[in-house]
Amino acid sequence: MKKIVSIISIFAIILSATQFVLADYSDDTTITDGQFAYKKGTNNILAYVGTTGICEIPENTTLKGLTPSWAKDAAPITKLIINDNVDINMIISGELVNLNKLKEVEIKEGVTEIPYQFLKGCNNLEKITLPSTIEIIDDEAFSECSKLSTLDLNDGLQSIGRYAFSETTLSGNLNIPDTVTHMDVTAFTDCGNLDKVHMSNNIECEKDKKYCYWFPQTDIKEINIPDTMLNCTNCYFHGEIGRASCRERV
């Protein structure tokens, strides 16, 4: 009987401590609900406070922060799942987002845009899963993700921003879908050793720019040159294939 009482007492103490930790995140402006701390009266997520390391952002929320210092008891995030209709509005620099343990990101169908500097500098990120609904990958979205070695881009993607995948370690083949019409300069700067690149056949020549190149300091063994680039004299390719205008390469 004493043993049962002792076990119940220990369980009660543990439960009480857990409740205290959760309550500690709630104050006049913050409330804890499940694995997240929210700004009171809103759907704004301020922090992940879960203990598994698998962070799944609920639908119809605004993501303002994930790892502030006051959420010190939360497990480091190793997998991040973004559901449909999530407004990603994080401050990347500083204490609000520290994702140095993050290895995998899965973005669900329905999300249409990857914002500026979304996961810049996540140097343990190895895998990203993008939905077919993604239309825009903004500037520096995955730059400096030094362990990211594979990338699958789906039909439906329209625009890739400046330095979007710079300083990654991509290898093998890279397919840039024919739905892509805009790819900003230096999108794939210093991003590994690529065997074969399929460039979108619908990339638009931006004649207002003095130069337009996408792969500086990236080694490429084989690449197609889209018909849209044949008369684009300010278009250059860098890397193993050398620096030459499209007109000169054809």
Language model feature labels by segment:
Residues 69-75:
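Short, basic/hydrophobic alpha-helical segments
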Residues 70, 93-95, 115-118, 138-141, ...:
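Consensus positions within tandem repeat domains that build extended binding/scaffold surfaces
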